[in-house]
Amino acid sequence: NRPHHRPVAVELPHTPLAPQQPSHGAPAALATVLSAQGTPVTPDELVESVYLPELHGSLPEEMTATARRYRMLAYPLSGSLTSLLTEIAHGNPVLVMQNLGNDWFENWHFAVVIGYDLENKTLILRSGTTKRWDTTLAVFERTWARSDYWALLILPPGEIPASAGLLRYLQAAHDRETTGQADAALTAYRAASFRWPQETAAWLAYGNTLYAG
């Protein structure tokens, strides 16, 4: 990975806040990120894809699959606070999953991280119906840890996360290919071959997909 120089504080104020209906926090959070990345969509359009009535909520797998159906690259972050802050510093809001409950009561929640302040040790989220939710890093990490640090970056094909690792990125591109989006995968592989020009795996993936097409 390339070295990253993060500013002390960053906020992405133009990230929209999608309107949320009761129990539809996941569609709203996903709509927020998709819209921020140039794919305007409403939570109502996503409910059927991500909301599971029997669970009264959503699962990460549905969130990831739905992002791909909108022809976006769904890149799972490594689960470190460093990678999350790096993406925010580069202008990318990050979809996260938290458990706001406790040891005896689970309260799963999807939110979008849109800023941080390292001096004050705080994060800024689009959370539920709150456009600017401030929380401490300590509280966020505790609630985030309960989801095994699940975090998803959603980008247009061809854009590479600032914190990307080669194999993780190639896997995200391959997932596009296996869902019938070979053109989007090809765009991603091509970007990878330029980002990591010395890596044979990137060129092989690009060449094989180009040949198959």
Language-model segments: residues:
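Noncatalytic regulatory segments and standalone regulatory/sensor domains
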Residues: 1, 118-205
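Cysteine-nucleophile protease catalytic domains, especially the papain-like/related folds used
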Residues: 2-80, 84, 90, 156-159, ...
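Short, charged low-complexity intrinsically disordered segments located at boundaries
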Residues: 58-64, 95-97, 115, 167-175
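Specific register positions within alpha-helical solenoid repeats of the TPR/Sel1-like families, i.e.
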Residues: 177, 211-212
